[in-house]
A protein has these predicted regions:
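Multi-pass alpha-helical membrane architecture of UbiA-family
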Residues: 2-397
Length: 397
């Protein structure tokens, strides 16, 4: 049966029988402004799945880590900062879904179905509304917070969108991806900025100005914060190389230059990602060697055992769906590592509370399947070259 002779149906007539639908027609439905029939409750659940709260946990813990270098702030101010730290990752995930339709049709076909329940245009409107709310919350926390939030909203949304579309620029793409934890780390500081920045600048410029440097204890906190910022950047850039491997086939087909598609094969990309990931964790050692962190933080490197094992699993993975399962495990490992690091850097009750909250989000999302990189999404419900054609949606839908 040729594609043009396939039976036609509306999405209402199909119900849940999406296995009969061609991927090309589902993509056309989304691009044409249509969407699948769904209740409000289903759309809300789908929205949360597309926002992928489990992937926002490292950002939340990075916020807590950044906040631990400050003198503290009132609970309401801290709670708002933490909420905004979670929101920036959630918003970026939603935006990427709206812009990565072609890649997702190859890498995560099930995600196209989820997008079709929301609709591409409504999702973009929602992303813009969420960005406006985040900026309003950032303004309430002061000029520093608002400045970095503005950069985060623009920068992270340019990961998949023109004119920059940094995901197609290998090094820049990894650096922008790393900002998913770096900006929350900066939000932690800017929730209660104190004089950390002024102290750091004074310490750096004192020899040039011929002036006395700030007190050593004050300067040490600022230098520690800067060193941890550098470590988190390297760590999450390496995680970006890991994340790119499961998307190898779709990104290659779309002509997107990533750290993975620059390699000759998926396995070569996996080897590179595994090596860089192990090296990034080990880069915590120089922070202790130069006296910028206490020796106890090296206990967090016990996570190198599961990190290495998971890297080997990535190298052995034969296809995208199998690699996606490895990537999901990597998120648990990454969250566990930064939670351990937080508790070692700042062994306080507030840190424990943030770790408990992060664990609840991570494991709650898994329990309730509130994610759009599940095995079902990687394998998808579609038959790419055969099936039922979708008739265009009625006007006004």
């Amino acid at each position: 049966m040729s594609p043009n002779s396939l039976p036609a149906a509306t999405h209402e007539e199909l119900g849940d029988e999406l296995s009969a639908v061609r991927m090309s027609d589902m993509m056309a439905l989304v691009r044409g402004g249509g969407r699948l029939a769904a209740t409000r409750g289903e759309r809300l659940r789908t929205l949360i799945m597309l926002g992928r709260p489990r992937t926002c946990v490292p950002g939340l813990l990075a916020f807590a880590l950044g906040f631990s270098y400050t003198a503290g702030a009132p609970l309401a101010r801290t709670a708002l900062g933490a909420t905004l730290a979670l929101s920036i990752g959630f918003s970026a995930n939603l935006h990427n879904v709206a812009t990565d339709l072609y890649e997702d049709s190859r890498n995560l076909p099930g995600r196209v179905t989820l997008l079709a329940k929301i609709g591409a245009r409504p999702l973009i409107v929602l992303c813009r509304s969420l960005s406006a709310l985040m900026m309003a919350g950032a303004v309430a926390l002061g000029a520093y917070f608002a400045l970095f939030m503005g950069l985060a909203v623009v920068g992270l949304h340019q990961y998949s969108s023109p004119p920059v579309r940094s995901k197609g620029r290998p090094i820049l793409g990894l650096w922008v991806f790393a900002q998913a934890v770096v900006f929350p780390f900066l939000f932690g500081w800017t929730t209660a900025p104190g004089r950390m920045l002024e102290t750091l600048l004074a310490a750096m410029t004192a020899p040039l100005r011929g002036a006395a440097p700030p007190p050593a204890a004050e300067a040490w906190t600022s230098w520690r914060y800067l060193a941890m910022w550098f470590f988190l950047t390297l760590w999450f850039m390496a995680k970006g190389t890991f994340k790119n491997v499961p998307d190898y086939d779709g990104d290659l087909a779309a002509g997107i230059r990533t750290s993975a598609t620059l390699c000759k094969s998926r396995r070569s990309a996996a080897r590179l990602a595994a090596a860089l990931t192990v090296a990034s964790y080990a880069s915590l050692v120089p922070l202790v060697a130069f006296g910028l962190e206490r020796p106890r933080v090296l206990v967090a490197l016990a996570w190198l055992v599961p990190v290495t094992a998971n890297g080997l699993r990535l190298v052995r993975a034969e296809d995208g769906p199998t690699s996606n399962a490895v990537l999901r495990a990597d998120m648990v490992i990454s969250s566990g590592f930064i939670a351990t690091l937080l508790l070692l850097v700042a062994p306080r009750l507030e840190s424990v509370a943030m770790v408990v909250l992060g664990a609840a989000i991570l494991f709650g999302s898994d329990l309730l399947e509130l994610d759009s990189r599940r095995d079902a999404d990687a394998r998808g419900p579609f038959a790419p070259d055969s099936g039922v054609q979708l008739r265009p949606p009625p006007r006004g839908m």
